[in-house]
Amino acid sequence: MFTINAEVRKEQGKGASRRLRRANKFPAIVYGGNQELVSIELDHDQVINMEQKAEFYSDVLTLVIDGKETKVKVQAVQRHPFKPKLAHIDFLRA
C-alpha cells in the first residue's frame, strides 16, 4: 500500500502550477465520493518513485492531506512531453 503526503494548494492557475513545478512539486486534484473537490500539491520525488510500480495504478492509495487520511485511486496521469516528469494527477476517492 502506498501513502503519499500532500498539502492543499493555496494558489490556482498556470503561474502557480509553474512555480510548484520549479519547486520540485506538482499539482493534483482529488474528487468523487459526494464531497468537494480538493486541489493539492505533491512532492515530485516521492511520487515518481511510487509511480514506476504497476501497483500504483491498480491499488487503493492513502493520501495524507494536511494530516487527514483519504483513500483514493489514480484516475489520470499527465506527464511532461519529453522530460521524465509528472505534470498532474487526478485521484478518485475510493
UniProtKB/Swiss-Prot annotation:
In Swiss-Prot or TrEMBL terms, this protein is called: Large ribosomal subunit protein bL25
Transmembrane parts of this sequence: none
Task: Give the GO terms filed under biological process for this record.
Answer: translation
Coiled-coil annotation: which residues? none
Function field: This is one of the proteins that binds to the 5S RNA in the ribosome where it forms part of the central protuberance.
Originating organism: Photorhabdus laumondii subsp. laumondii (strain DSM 15139 / CIP 105565 / TT01) (Photorhabdus luminescens subsp. laumondii)
Is RNA-binding one of the keywords UniProt gives this record? Answer: yes
Instruction: Write the record's keywords in alphabetical order, separated by commas.
Output: Ribonucleoprotein, Ribosomal protein, RNA-binding, rRNA-binding
Name the InterPro entries for this protein. Answer: Rbsml_bL25/Gln-tRNA_synth_N, Ribosomal_bL25/Gln-tRNA_synth, Ribosomal_bL25_short, Ribosomal_L25_dom, Ribosomal_uL5_bac-type
Q: Does the keyword NADP apply?
A: no
Gene behind this chain?
Answer: rplY
Q: State the oligomer form and interacting partners.
A: Part of the 50S ribosomal subunit; part of the 5S rRNA/L5/L18/L25 subcomplex. Contacts the 5S rRNA. Binds to the 5S rRNA independently of L5 and L18.
Per the similarity annotation, which family is this? Belongs to the bacterial ribosomal protein bL25 family.
Instruction: State the signal peptide span.
Output: none
Any one GO cellular component localisation term in the record: cytosolic large ribosomal subunit
A single GO molecular-function term is: structural constituent of ribosome
